Amino acid sequence: MLPLTAAITAGGASSRFGSDKALALWQGRPLLDQVAAGLAACERRLLIAPPGKYALPGWETWPDTRPGEGPLAGLEVALTHAAPGWVAFTGVDNPALTSDYWLTLLAACRPGMSSVQALHPERGPQPLGALYHTALLPRVTGLLAAGERRLRLTAPAEQTVLVTGLGAHFFQNVNRPADLAELSGRGEESLEV
């Protein structure tokens, strides 16, 4: 088991997708199941979603306490209910994040750091699909109370470890049906670290 709490946020409206993207199929399985499979080895697993909306055996479901306020609000719920330590946090629209991806981030954890994020070769740090320490909870709550919604502000830069060398294919975010079609065209062989 990985010494992490896994957390998937699945409370968005899927407005750009046109239907519930958590249930959209990729490689014959719903996106939610694909994302959960990459995090299956985590000691504790949290699904941030409306109660009763999804069935994910072995996962605790917690409602988004600030619906409509984005992934930062989902992270607040995850940090609140996680075991003390590191949380592997991602969205339902990141199905290419394998267990090897999470192991790579976990190996980069350092004392005194509060986040571990993959560094996209072109777009920089990736705050969704990252590790966050539960010590960040007061900061996240403060950001939300101040009206902030940007996940990238969660951890101070000097407390963030950036992991290089991960392929760009890990960062395919499924927001539209065309994104899912593009991801499907890549196949499984491109999803290794």
UniProtKB/Swiss-Prot annotation:
One of its GO terms (cellular component) is cytoplasm. It catalyses: Mo-molybdopterin + GTP + H(+) = Mo-molybdopterin guanine dinucleotide + diphosphate. Mg(2+) binds at residue 93. It comes from the Bacteria. Its EC number is 2.7.7.77. Its cofactor is Mg(2+). GO terms for biological process: Mo-molybdopterin cofactor biosynthetic process. Belongs to the MobA family. The N-terminal domain determines nucleotide recognition and specific binding, while the C-terminal domain determines the specific binding to the target protein. Transfers a GMP moiety from GTP to Mo-molybdopterin (Mo-MPT) cofactor (Moco or molybdenum cofactor) to form Mo-molybdopterin guanine dinucleotide (Mo-MGD) cofactor. This is Probable molybdenum cofactor guanylyltransferase.
